Amino acid sequence: MKKWVVLLALLGVSGLFLPCEAQQIMYANLRELVECEGDTVTTLRVERRSRNQILLMGGGDYRIETVENRGLNRYLRKRCYAVRIDTALYVNCRKMRYKRYRFGNCYAATMHVGDKFYFCAQPVGQAATSTAQSPDATKLGGEVGDAIAASALVAARVFYEINPETGRAEFVGKDKMMALLEGYPDLQANLRLEQSEAADVMVRYLQALQRLGE
């Protein structure tokens, strides 16, 4: 009897160190993402794209693919709407639109706050790019100025909210964030003091809303 107890105890302890596969879920559209009704897979891998890759080809910060499955890779590139790997969520930039602008290919990191989704991507369009405009580019102008501006945009990130009805992206600037913080005067007061609408600023307020909603 004692031998069985010892054996079970050893198995229990060793089980704590067994490798655990990450939960991987693919969502075909926004409805599936909202309702958490996706397809579970086990072979996906996430790769952070380099700055040079983004500068040359545009698109999101992450490439998500699988090994030796061309059909699934094609689906991930062109048709898949979003992917969740454990607690990390990514949306397919190919599916996103901000006014008449597109975000290219690959995937963008996404936050789930309340019943809304916010993804982090390069600034596009006049409203967004104004938040990341390099002062050097404004001074120089011409081809050199354009090159500096393009390089600055590769590194710049802002947040967009996915409209749950239309699926289109809405830029999350200070005005939008102020509306989201309605009912939290202390956070609104802090936001008024901010000098930037960049992602590294806005993420603090999105995280605060996440905590308040828990």
Label the model's feature ranges.
Residues 10, 15-19, 173, 183-186, ...:
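General "foldedness" signal
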Residues 178-214:
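C-terminal partner/receptor-binding element of secreted or periplasmic proteins
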Residues 1-26:
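Bacterial Sec-dependent N-terminal signal peptides
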